[in-house]
Amino acid sequence: GLGDSLSYLAMSNGDSDIASIHRYRIIIPFLADLVRDAIRPLISSDQLHTIDALSFYLVNYLITSLAGLFLYLFLIELKFKPERSLMGVFIFLGSRITILSTGAPMVDSLYYLAIIVIVYFCLTQRSMLLCLLTPLLILTKETTVPFLFLPLLLKTINRKLILLSLSVSFAILFWVRSLVTATVPNVSKSEHPILVTITSHLSSGLDSLSQSYFSLAGWHDLFSPFSVFWVIALFGAWIEIKKIDTYYEIPRFLFWIIPFAFGFAVLSSNSGRMLHSLFPLVIPYALIAIDYIMSRKQLKD
């Protein structure tokens, strides 16, 4: 939302005295600050007022592009043909939520990149890469944390290594949070723990629950991540359940994303952005349905 964007813009300009729920999502504002310094000489004086928004856009554009690349590799690993995998990337990139998180001064693009990186490395059983990346991924956004436990559900992953990495990562998380808090004047010690963020979201989420799920605007928000592809994905899931097409097999660990996404949707005042985290599950099922429809059409022809 607008409040989120204003907070991140302030952070990129060195102001940490903002809402605690935004204060610790430091990576993208930090990168936007670096980009702003790099491109400032290239911007004419009459356009300098746009430099903050442009800096965020360039950072988010790169991150979203990386998310699209990892999504393509993820879909290839699920045995989709290159053209179908590319279609899945276009579904992701064409989503209203992806466009908003890329074009606005937001940090959600890094959240979606973190999700697809985690599930891709889980699928390809890259224990060491997961171990090395977890300390960085945990700093992206609080909502990334549950996804970091997904590798523990897989017997083929080195769980001891992942547990060690998680232990180090949480130590780094709270250390970084304490450093950020130390830069904020007149902040109480009880204000910055991660539980404050959860409590704040829970309070606002429950207050807006009826508006989110029992109003026209709320249904629009729920529909916005994947629009018609929600329905197509449900058809794809039905195809798998009925074993009409057994060529594709969606890994079971991905279904844990469902409670994560819907749980965060309840906590958040913007359920669309939270439900968009289902894209590693929704897009493959949508592609299964599309592949089935296209193959049936070819048989008729």
Task: Map each language-model feature to its residues.
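Extracytoplasmic catalytic/substrate-binding loops of multi-pass membrane glycan-assembly enzymes
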Residues: 1-10, 19-35, 187, 202
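Membrane-embedded glycan-lipid processing machinery
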Residues: 20, 24, 55-62, 91, ...
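Transmembrane alpha-helices of multi-pass, membrane-embedded glycan-processing enzymes
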Residues: 28, 32, 36, 55-70, ...
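Transmembrane-helix signature of polytopic, membrane-embedded enzymes
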Residues: 68-94
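Specific aromatic-rich, kink-prone transmembrane helix
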Residues: 70, 110-130, 281-285
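Membrane-interface alpha helices of multi-pass inner-membrane proteins
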Residues: 116-121, 128-141, 146-153, 262
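Perimembrane helix-loop-helix junctions
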Residues: 124, 146-169
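Membrane-lumen/periplasm interface segments of specific transmembrane helices
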Residues: 158-243, 252
